[in-house]
A protein has these predicted regions:
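Phosphate-binding site recognition
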Residues: 1-254
Length: 254
C-alpha cells in the first residue's frame, strides 16, 4: 500500500458506469465519464434544427440525450449548470445557452409489448407520464387546452395522443415565452417490436402522424433531436421532413 503525504490529495477512484444513462447520476456519483459535451456545441454551431442520430444499442445514445436535457432545461438551471463545470462545453462560447429552454424528453427504450393493444397502452402511459411532469401548466391553460391536456394526463380514450408532443410544445412556449428543445430517444424501439410481433402497420400508422406533428409541423420547438437504430430510409414515418439531418456512427461530425 502506497502512503500519501499529508498535503497530498488522494484521488478517489471513479466507478465504471455500467447501465447508467442519466447524466446527473453519472456526474454526481463520480462515475467515469468520457466527455461528450462537445456534442452540444456541434449541434448549436451547425444550425440544424432536426437531427436523427442512428447508433447500435449500448452506444450511449440515451446518456447523450440525458446530457442535452440537463444542459438546455430551464428548470433547475442553476443546479444543472454545476454538472457541466470543468467539462468541454463550459469552455465554449455556447455555454450561455445553458438553461435557456423548456425541454420535452420522451424515451421508448423500455418498450417491450407483443401486441398493438398493449403497445398502444404503453405509448399512452409514456405520454401520460410526460404530461404529469408538466401538470403545473394546467393553471394557465385555456378551457379547451385544459380539456385536451387532461384527456392525456388522465389517459382517457378521447386523448389526442398523436398530437401530444406538438400540443405540449405550444403549452410550454406560451408559459415560458421560449421555444422548446424536443428530445425523442429510441424512436424505433416500438417499430422493431411491432415488426417482430405482427402489428407493424398499427405502429407505423400511429407514428406517422405523431412524428409529423411533433417534428415537421412543430413551430414551437427550436431544436428536435431523435435517436434510434434504424436509418430513416427504412421507415416512412419521417416522410416529408426534407431538412432532417441523419447522422450515423460513421460520421465524425455530430
Amino acid at each position: 500500500m502506497i502512503k500519501k503525504g499529508k498535503n497530498e490529495k488522494i484521488e478517489k477512484k471513479k466507478n465504471l458506469p455500467v447501465g447508467i444513462d442519466n447524466f446527473e447520476v453519472m456526474i454526481q456519483n463520480n462515475y467515469y465519464y468520457f466527455d461528450k459535451t462537445g456534442l452540444i456545441e456541434e449541434i448549436l454551431e451547425s444550425g440544424t434544427t432536426r437531427i436523427l442520430f442512428t447508433r447500435p444499442r449500448r452506444f450511449g445514445k440515451s446518456l447523450n440525450m440525458s446530457m442535452l436535457k440537463y444542459f438546455f432545461d430551464v428548470k433547475n438551471k442553476d443546479e444543472n449548470k454545476k454538472l457541466f463545470e470543468n467539462l468541454e462545453i463550459s469552455k465554449s462560447e455556447y455555454f450561455d445557452r445553458q438553461g435557456q429552454n423548456p425541454v420535452i424528453f420522451i424515451s421508448f427504450k423500455d418498450f417491450e409489448e407483443t401486441n398493438w393493444e398493449n403497445g398502444f397502452n404503453s405509448i399512452k402511459e409514456e405520454i401520460k407520464s410526460l404530461y404529469n411532469e408538466f401538470r403545473f401548466l394546467r393553471e394557465k391553460l385555456e378551457k379547451s387546452d385544459l380539456m385536451d391536456f387532461d384527456n392525456i394526463w388522465l389517459k382517457k380514450k378521447e386523448g389526442n395522443y398523436s398530437r401530444a408532443l406538438s400540443n405540449l410544445s405550444r403549452y410550454l412556449f406560451e408559459y415560458y415565452g421560449k421555444k422548446v428543445v424536443l428530445l425523442i430517444d429510441e424512436y424505433d424501439k416500438p417499430i422493431i417490436k411491432a415488426h417482430a410481433n405482427g402489428y407493424y402497420n398499427n405502429v407505423i400508422n400511429f407514428f406517422k402522424t405523431f412524428f409529423e406533428k411533433a417534428v415537421k409541423g412543430n413551430d414551437y420547438a427550436e431544436i428536435k433531436v431523435i435517436t434510434g437504430i434504424l436509418r430513416i430510409a427504412k421507415e416512412g414515418i419521417f416522410s416529408g421532413l426534407n431538412n432532417l439531418e441523419v447522422h450515423t456512427i460513421l460520421e465524425k461530425k455530430i
